[in-house]
Structure formats: C-alpha cells, structure tokens
C-alpha cells in the first residue's frame, strides 16, 4: 500500500493539484493548522491535528470550494535553542532518543548543537512526514519565522499593536528561567506546560526570633489559625527581607529573591529547632505554637503555613495525629448552610482518609464549597483584637470571596502582610531542565491582554466563531477572562527583534498569532523576488488593511502598483480564515492570542470564522513518553501500518475533543476493512447479475442515506461518526446485500454494485485518498483525479425511503425473534409469525404517534367503549412511546400492510434465522390457541 501512496503523492505534486490561486468563479475555503517547531522528528501523535485539517480540506475541495491549505515552520524562540544546547552539553537521554527511537545517524547528532542546522534538518524531516502522510499542501507558500520577509510582517504587526496601546512596558510577574534569565511560556518548557501564576498572601506572625510569614491562599481563615506548620526535616533561614527579620525555608528565600530585592540571609537553622516557638496572630492577638509536619512543602510559598483545623482537612488530620489525646482546638470561621461551620473536621471524620491523595481530594471539596457557598460567621468580631475590631466590623456575614478581598487589603494596608506569586502547577521545567520560578519583571515589554477594550473585542470575535467541539467554547471564554499582561519578548532565541527596542526578540507565542494572513501573499513575495527592505509599514498597511495611496506606496517602495494591488486582491480573496486547527492544549495561549490579535488588527469581516481543537493520541491507552518506550516515529509508523490506515487511525477513531487511543488492534481492524473493500473492487467483474430487486433498491438507498449522514458529519467535523458509517456500517451493509441476493439464489447486480461502490469511493477519499486514487485509476479506469471529483449529491438520488423503512422493520422482527430464541429450549423447527392484517390498528398507532405522548388527547379522539377497548388503546399508546423514529416514519408516512411486507421479505428472514418460517394474518383464533396477541409492528411469534 505504501508504494501506492508514494505513486499518487508524486503524481499530485507533479500536476500541482494543491497549488491554489484565486478563482472568483468558485467559493474559497482557507484552512490552516499550527505550524510546527522543527526541533525533533514527528511521532504518530503529531499526525492527528494535521490529518484532521487535511481531511476537511479534501472534503471541501470535493464540495466545489477553491481550497487553500498552506504550511510554514516556527523557528522562533527557545524550543530549538534549548534542544541545541542540550545536544551541545551531551544530554544522554536526548541523544539516545534521537539515535534509538528516531534512528538519526550518530554522525549528524553532534552537528545539531548548531540551532539553525537542527531547525533546517528537522524542517526537512517534518516536511517529508507531511508529504508521506498525504497532506495536500500548497508548498509554494512555505516560509520560516526567521525569514527577513516574514520578520517585516511581524514588525508591522507589533507597530500596529503598540499604536493601539496593546503593548506596554511594565512590571509584572512572569514565569522565569533562572539559568537563561528570560521569561518562559508554554513553548519554552519541557512537555509544553504553561506556568500558571497565582497569588499567595503572606501573613506576618511575630515571634521573639523574628516574623514567620505564613503563605496562604485563604487569608480569610486567619481567625481560625491554631498553630503554624513548618517542616522539621528541612533547612530554614533567618533573613533580612523588606526591612524585617523573617523566618522562612531556605528554598523559599532563594525563590523569592526573584520577586523581592535585597534578601540577605543572616542565619541558617534546621526546621526542628523552630518547633515549639510561640507566635502571635496579627489579627486576633492570640499566641499559638509552631508545630512540625513533614507534609509541608518548603518549595511552595514560604515553607510556613497556618494550621486551621476547622477549614483545612490536612490541618485537622495531622493535628489529630500530633495531639494524641484528640484535644484539638477548633475555631470555626466559615459557615455553609446545611453543612455546618467546621466542614474540614466533618469531612475527615466522615470519610476517614487513608492517604495524602485522599486528603487532597477532600481539600479541593472543602475549599470549593466554602468559597462558593460559605459566609464568614456573623460574630467574627469576637475573635478580632480590639484595635482592629471597628475597621473589620463589616466582615461578619460576608460571602467568602468578599471577605477574602477585604482581609487581604487590610493586612497589606497595615503592614501585616503582602502578596507573593507562585507557579501553581509546579514543578514546571525550562527546556534546559531548570525549574521555573516567578520573577517580578521590571521594564519588560508586555502584550496587555488585561486591556478591557481589547478583551471586549476578543469576546465579540469569539461569539462569532464556530468552535468545534462546541463544549470547548467555555475554555476560550475562561481564558479570555483570566488573561493578563504577557511578556512578548526575550533576550535570547531566534526571531524578529522588537522594532523599537532591538535588544529584545519577539517570542514564539507572540509572532504566531496572525501569520495566517502572511500565507495569502508569501508565494508572491518569492515570485516577484521582493527584498525585505521594500516590505515597509506602508506596504503592509495597504495589503492587509487597504490603508494608503497605492501610487505613493509604489513610488516609495519601488514595487509596481499593479503588483501591490495584486497582493491586496489575493489577500482579500482568501481572508478571513475559514478554520484554524490545533490541539486543545493550545486554548489557554496560542488559540486565544490568535483571537485577540485578529480582533485588534483586522476589521470585523476579516476575523476568523471557526476554530477546531482536538485531543491527544494515546498509544495502547497511555500517553507517549520516552520513559515508557512507546513512542512510534510517524515515518516509521507509516511504513509499519500503511499511509491511509494511519490517517484514519490517528484522526478519526475518537470524537474531536477526546483522545484517540492508537492500538495494534485498531490499525489491524482499519487495515482489514480497507483491504476488504479493495478486494471487492478488484472482483467487481465477477458479479454478472442484472436483476433490480429489493436488495438493489435497498443498497442504493443505503449508500445515499450514508452520503447524507456522512456529509452532515463532515460539516460538523464528526470524523469518528463519518468513518464508522463509511467503513464499519457500510461493510455490514454490503454483507447484508450479498446475503439478500444469496437468499434469492442469484448473482449480485454488477451495475448497481459498481454505482454504489463508486459513490462510496468518493466518500472515503478525504480519509484514504491514496487507496481511492489507485482504485479510481487502476480498477475503474478513470482518467481524472478522484481527489478533484465532486462530492456525491443526495438531491434527486435513487434513495427509496419506503424500502429502507421496510428493511428496518424486518430487522426489528428478526431481533425480536432472536431474543425469544435465546431463551427457547430445544431446536426450533418452525417459526410462525402472525401479523395484524387490519388497517384500523395501524391507524390507531398513527394517531398515538401524532398525539406525541399526550394520552388524554389520544383517548379523547378514540373514546374506549369497554375495558377491552381501553386495554388495547393503552397498549397501542405505549407502543407509540417505545418505537424509534424510523418506525414512526414508516407508520405516519406510509400505508403498509405488515403481512405483505413480511411475505415480500420472507426469504431474507428465513436465511437470517436459518429456520423455516410461516407468515399468516393474526386473528382471534391465534390468541385462543397460543395465548399470544399481536399489536401494530409487533406480530405474535410462535416457535415450534
């Protein structure tokens, strides 16, 4: 099969069928998939997003659209630099991965210490992967993000953002690599993890040795603090910090030095030496003890935490272990209606946790419940020291969120605390291997995603975007709301210099937000050999926004006006972007930035129309990782399993938002089904029948029904449902057809079979284009490319709804009989089917269906005259509630006689059951003899 794939990939490329140019006579469809970082080869997991985009592009092309599907490569930022650095340092694990898993020559690997060599090497490798998996890309438009022509476009973009006030110089917390001294985002970290920055509140507890700054996410619980926890096994320091002598963990002091200037270590001390000290609660004035607990994470916050047993499951659980006599002080602070005022204590007692993992789950429940439903107790004033009581009198009865805000502001205003920042999803590691910290960055350039005006534009844009799957919309909405300032430049890495401050390089998630617009004209820059110096701000203003005087711009740039106009027209032909494909992990950054930046720069009619996000690819149920040794390089996978099998397996065997589970059994099933279809096409000439009977009408109707449902699935990107119908349901339909003609003792109809299979071949083309092209040319002897053929139309087709519904009715009867046979003792010799032959019963069922579940309405029409009438009407009404939509359609749209239908289909029923059958009209004699009653669509079935 791979020879077939290579043959057609070569032919398509030679004939340039994916090179797309404006064609005003056709509707356009512009689709893009995130361009890749060329810092390693692709494995099978990379294929999903790209094949999904390709399948949709191929489908739209067959629907008559002029489709543009381009590709480029993302050289910007630190991903490539970090990988090259690792090679230069002799990173054993990485070198072994390249050598053993990806089979890169040992002679080549050392040369990858040069970032550009690495990027260019893997660019060609990834490009080969894209070609080999059959992506129909217009390669004329290819570029890299360090091409000077593209840099001129990014420079223009940043001038636009700055002119609108969306780029600011500010002080702000950022994820930070302590080794490289640069801000770090998702694409700079191992595993592409976005550092999530959150706030802790420090509360200052005085002691004779200094201040213990307890770090908390819940400052409102300070009133219930009964102790402080520290880790007795770890090192702590006495440090001069913020003009105060503070006691915190050694690791915390090192980490906080990136947020607080001039921290000086005066003394190092073992945590165990601090246990037993007394500290003063700054709000209540109460003196409490410092206790030791190994569960305290000294790298989180300050390594000092409050113990609030009433509201923290960990604190209650470990207080019980510490105070063996169970003499635990409980000071309730928060009341939850119906759940009392000491929720942590109650849930620990009730659930009896066995591990820290159990305690974490209880903690999440308590924190969430108290935050959403809790209020501060009304008599809170009794716990507050007198000097603050008046200022804090409004706290009692407040909902927890408001109480938290009030007490935080109070602590800071009185000098009793401050805020610090933490990586909430720690540990997150830079690609160099260093753990990320939070740094308060001064004089840094930020994209100000907190700008209210800009947020509103993003919300408006999102409201017009078709998000696939729709349930991902809430993730976009959430991201838009929480996004704040984001560092947009680094002092290290590849990329475009910040135009007004060239010591900074624009980072990778900031130069990749509107590059889709650049695709529309990138090939023309090459075609006309335009130098980057000619691609001025005025040039881009005109091409992208229609701003400026064409003749003046032509004179200034030296580019003929007709060429500039050609650029503008091509851009307007393709834009807006019709759909953007990416992994769902990029919603919290790239995809939302994509929305923001388009909304900021382009007019509303050029905003993106749709975004499709997909899940990951697992291997045998597990995430692919080096440690599990379960990574399959994509190019190797294509050789092992076949191109079209891989395309289907990685893209179309799970819902869009779910993870695909790639497995040996999956690819085997897909491969066997494709091969079965291939063999059937090869054997077409063996079928010589010409009878057009019920089986042929049914098969023709089925292929058009499948065409209709596949079209619906493709429009919604429900690829799993489409593949299920095309491969597995249709394969079963073919078995059914051959079974029916066999029951009639005749050959299959060659003409019908050829027509049906040709329609199927077109439907499967977006998924398996290589196999489809081979069959189209070599077996069906066609001269055109099937990938350029039109999509099958259902309108005016040979679909016979009654035939489909009669077959569905037969299927239902067979299922009923089989369920009886399952409990039948002995060997059945004859099955008697007694069906109603009285049209009045079918009319009653029709009326019951029309009543749509309203029994009174149904009974009012038919008014039972006896108990027996009422019983029968009740049974028919119940039947109307139980039957599916297809059977309802059969009853309401057609006047069928069940006996006639069953007699017509009796040969097929007999073959399915492999038992003699007798079909007779139902009458009262049957009821007397067998004590069985027939109802509409429910014949009486007797097995002898």
From Swiss-Prot:
ATP binds at residue 626. GO terms for molecular function: aminoacyl-tRNA deacylase activity; ATP binding; leucine-tRNA ligase activity. InterPro entries: aa-tRNA-synth_Ia, Leu-tRNA-lgase_arc, Leu-tRNA-synth_Ia_arc/euk, M/V/L/I-tRNA-synth_anticd-bd, Rossmann-like_a/b/a_fold, tRNAsynth_Ia_anticodon-bd, Val/Leu/Ile-tRNA-synth_edit. A motif ('HIGH' region) lies at residues 36-46. Keywords: Aminoacyl-tRNA synthetase, ATP-binding, Cytoplasm, Ligase, Nucleotide-binding, Protein biosynthesis. It is an enzyme of class 6 (ligase). GO terms for cellular component: cytoplasm. Pfam families: Anticodon_1, tRNA-synt_1. NCBIfam families: leuS_arch, PRK12300.1. HAMAP family: Leu_tRNA_synth_A (MF_00049_A). Belongs to the class-I aminoacyl-tRNA synthetase family. This is Leucine--tRNA ligase 2. It comes from Saccharolobus solfataricus (strain ATCC 35092 / DSM 1617 / JCM 11322 / P2). The lineage of its organism: Archaea, Thermoproteota, Thermoprotei, Sulfolobales, Sulfolobaceae.
